[in-house]
Swiss-Prot record:
Compositionally biased intervals (Acidic residues): 1-17
Family designation: Belongs to the DEAD box helicase family. DECD subfamily.
Compositionally biased spans, kind Basic and acidic residues: 33-46
Cellular localization per UniProt: Nucleus
Role: ATP-binding RNA helicase involved in transcription elongation and required for the export of mRNA out of the nucleus. SUB2 also plays a role in pre-mRNA splicing and spliceosome assembly. May be involved in rDNA and telomeric silencing, and maintenance of genome integrity.
UniProt source species: Yarrowia lipolytica (strain CLIB 122 / E 150) (Yeast)
Biased composition, class Polar residues, residue ranges: 21-30
EC class of the enzyme, as a word: hydrolase
Keywords: ATP-binding, Helicase, Hydrolase, mRNA processing, mRNA splicing, mRNA transport, Nucleotide-binding, Nucleus, RNA-binding, Spliceosome, Transport
Motif DECD box in this chain: 210-213
Name of the molecule in the record: ATP-dependent RNA helicase SUB2
SUPFAM superfamilies for this protein: P-loop containing nucleoside triphosphate hydrolases
Length: 441
């Protein structure tokens, strides 16, 4: 990488929010009903396929539909993760579930498999609603439904989000041949469809919110969720999932539920992303580009995601990288929706190996080839660090996370991360890192 002029990137504020701090689950209740809390420690694990398995438990033990088991085999999954072992047996029985588990342990598969297991498709009736906070995550969840419903040809799934023509959504809903049984959506667009009487949700049996803390923390989104929730039947299953749940958000989640099973996988106070190597680099702001180029030149990686703190810095850094022989794409909230989805697909399909992003890509996005995450700008809060570095080393695979530390504020955040998650983040070694420690063989 050439380094003509070590220019600092211009910085303008970005509107994306940071995750709230969170705490571990002690107990829970909903009115007078006592809610059960299950804590799972990650012990006696063994590496199996793409998930970390415990003992010899397999997906067949859940007595899933043969069509689902075939799809699971096609995906190459042998053993369920900890969160799947605890959640799936309860969720397929219709139990309300509030689940907090760290990034990369297969939470999405829990609600996808459990809703497909329970689904008996009726033409023209929506049975499952899944809400999430970004278009990219909605698109990804829809793809997970497509993967696991591969051998369930009668099941129809649709994704609705703002920024695309609403008339296309209306036409899809009104056509009985395409009317979905499973709807994945962002709250604003789904509320608009419900409000204007284009969509009826009187037959919904399962209501899911992924990254529920992010959805319910934002007042506008929470209001949309409440309006959607009101038009669904009183008797239904409600499931919510996230990597972080604060003391403030947890009771809000439980207002939507009836005696939920609360599940906490491992000690949320510890950052135990197995196989993820974590380092930091002391570097002046003006030298970040040079250091980043050195890392990209010298490190082996499949795909890398580079996090910055604003849309303007994402644009600026991607231009610098492309100009210096590192083809990359940028994903952030300032890009029109259709273009964002196109860039996400381009990266997921391995057409680009480098992605520069704001925190819009910091939650829930699952791209299996990512094994390197770089915090060009450290997040302002410790919890967002967990979501960011969780993009690498998912599902028990290896990965590497490197954070640039440039200011006194960065040093404070780094200290908070290490204290918050009881993890030691060491200086990046001068001799580099052995690829075998973060590259899967």
């Amino acid at each position: 990488m050439s380094h003509e002029g070590e220019e600092e990137l211009l910085d303008y504020s970005d509107s994306e929010e940071i995750a709230l701090p969170s705490t571990t689950v002690e107990s829970g209740s909903n009115g007078d009903a006592k809610a059960e809390t299950t804590t799972v420690k990650e012990e006696n694990t063994e590496q199996k396929g793409s998930y970390v398995g415990i003992h010899s438990t397999g997906f067949r033990d859940f007595l899933l539909k043969p069509e689902l088991l075939r799809a699971i085999v096609d995906c190459g999954f042998e053993h369920p993760s900890e969160v799947q072992q605890v959640c799936i047996p309860q969720s397929i029985l219709g139990t309300d579930v509030l689940c907090q588990a760290k990034a990369g342990v297969g939470k999405t598969a829990v609600f996808v498999l459990s809703t497909l297991q329970q689904l008996e498709p009726v033409p023209g009736e929506c049975s499952v609603v899944v809400l999430c906070h970004t278009r990219e995550l909605a698109y990804q969840i829809m793809n997970e439904y497509a993967r696991f419903s591969k051998y369930l040809p009668d099941v129809k799934t649709a994704v609705f989000y703002g920024g695309s023509p609403i008339q296309k959504d209306i036409e899809l809903i009104q056509n009985k041949e395409t009317s979905p049984h499973v709807i994945v959506a962002t709250p604003g667009r789904l509320h608009a469809l419900v409000r204007d009487k284009h969509l009826r949700l009187g037959n919904v049996k399962t209501f899911v919110i992924d990254e529920c803390d992010k959805v319910l923390d934002q007042i506008d989104m929470r209001r949309d969720v409440q309006e959607i929730f009101r038009v669904t039947p009183r008797q239904k299953q409600v499931m919510m999932f996230s990597a972080t749940l604060s003391q403030e958000i947890r009771p809000i989640c439980k207002k939507f539920m009836s005696s939920p099973l609360e599940i906490l996988v491992d000690d949320e106070g510890k950052l135990t992303l197995h196989g993820l190597q974590q380092y930091y680099v002391d570097v002046e702001e003006k030298s970040k580009n040079r250091k980043l180029g050195d890392l990209l030149d010298n490190l082996e990686f499949n795909q890398v995601i580079i996090f910055v703190k604003s849309t303007s810095r994402a644009n600026g850094l991607s231009q610098v990288l492309n100009a210096n022989g590192f083809p990359c794409t940028a994903v952030h909230s300032g890009i029109p929706q259709e273009e964002r989805i196109a860039r996400y697909k381009e990266f997921k399909e391995f057409k680009k190996r480098i992605c520069v992003s704001t925190d819009v890509f910091g939650r829930g996005i699952d791209i299996e080839r990512i094994n390197l995450a770089i915090n060009y700008d450290l997040p302002a809060e410790a919890d967002q660090y967990l979501h960011r570095v969780g993009r690498a080393g998912r599902f028990g695979t290896k990965g590497l996370a490197i954070s640039f530390v440039s200011t006194p504020e960065d040093k404070e955040v780094l200290a908070k991360i290490q204290e918050r998650f009881e993890v030691n983040i060491a200086p990046y070694p001068a001799e580099g890192v052995d690829p075998s420690t973060y590259m899967n063989s």
